[in-house]
A protein has these predicted regions:
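FIC/Doc superfamily catalytic core
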Residues: 1-326
């Protein structure tokens, strides 16, 4: 798809009545969040707390149940806790700490909320690879997956197992999930499945290029961009595993970069973790490739972002009151 065609398609989606209304509601909620009293001086702490809560929510989507307080204690333990590229030998902990590391990295790329510092963000392909290494690296160190699938888009000839998508991820469902995490059985690669048809060859390469173009093309409608990038990560599945996790990380990154949530304190993973059935249903709707399905997905993404902003407002008040660890 040419750049002009991509822009035209995104603008057409943004003009759809339901999408336009959802976008307006998001900007109103974002403005309210931006002027939270706590964010005047303690926005750094709020962003850090959002990273903890996002990691916990994201881990739950991946089938790993970890408490926020337990993760905070791991982080406080320093390099031997959540901060190093090591394995705890517990896949649930490795998933949670990997997600926290990736979210913390994203915070480092965010502009100051008060001030003029604007860190340099890596090129999109490098950013995606780095975030994927953060998430999947501990699983490779622990021997659960091959290091060859970490940080690298899958080879075009690799076909994905067309497993049903139920909103879960790389740790969901025991053996089936470990197979989905890139393990081998009888010498054959068993990789992550998801909604939509399996892709390979030139089609896979073109769709990955389209994801990068969606991220890089300037002046696209923010809600439409965020929603499409997330959905394409779920349906194209350019990596062997953790595509959903990477998609949700990109949601946070793009929401801040494009001004949808300049605070960086939203927890947009929360909604998908609490209502996984709706997440799966919306992803399947998008994979249908119908206009109604795509719009339904964008509306779901808007709902997730709105709930994430509500969570951001709550955690900002908790940071101000000093009650985040209760």
């Amino acid at each position: 798809m040419s750049t002009n065609a991509l822009i035209d398609a995104c603008l057409a989606l943004a003009r759809e009545e339901r999408v336009a209304a959802a976008s307006e509601a998001l900007y109103e909620a974002s403005a309210q969040l931006r002027w939270q009293e706590a964010l005047r001086k303690r926005w750094r702490e709020a962003r850090a707390e959002a990273s903890v809560r996002a990691a916990v929510s994201g881990a739950a989507i991946e089938g790993a149940v970890v408490s926020a307080q337990a993760l905070r204690e791991q982080i406080a333990a320093g390099p031997k806790g959540a901060g190093a590229h090591t394995s705890s030998k517990d896949p649930a902990w490795d998933a949670a700490t990997g997600l926290w590391r990736a979210h913390s990295r994203l915070v480092g790329y965010m502009p100051d909320l008060v001030g003029r510092t604007r860190p340099v963000v890596p090129a999109t392909a490098q950013l995606m690879a780095t975030l994927h290494r953060d998430v999947a690296g501990p699983l490779a160190v622990g021997g659960l997956i091959s290091e060859a699938v970490v940080g690298c888009p899958r080879e075009s000839e690799q076909a994905l197992e067309n497993q049903s998508f139920e909103g879960g991820g790389m740790l969901e469902g025991g053996k089936a999930a470990l197979e989905g995490a890139g393990l081998r059985e009888n010498g054959n690669p068993l990789l992550e499945g998801g909604p939509g048809p399996n892709l390979g060859g030139q089609e896979l390469r073109e769709r990955l290029e389209q994801i990068v173009a969606l991220i890089d093309t300037p002046n696209l409608p923010a809600l439409v961009r965020v929603a499409l990038v997330h959905a394409e990560m779920l349906t194209v599945r350019p990596f062997a595993l953790a595509n959903g996790a990477l998609g949700r990380l990109l949601v946070r990154h793009l929401s801040v970069r494009d001004g949808l949530d300049p605070t960086g304190v939203s927890v947009s993973d929360y909604y998908a973790g609490r209502v996984p059935g709706a997440y799966a249903e919306a992803a399947q709707a998008y994979a249908s490739a119908s206009l109604e399905g795509v719009v339904a997905w964008i509306i779901w993404q808007a709902e997730a972002l709105l709930e994430g902003m509500r969570q951001g407002s709550e955690l900002s008040r908790a940071v101000q009151a000093g009650t985040t660890q209760r």
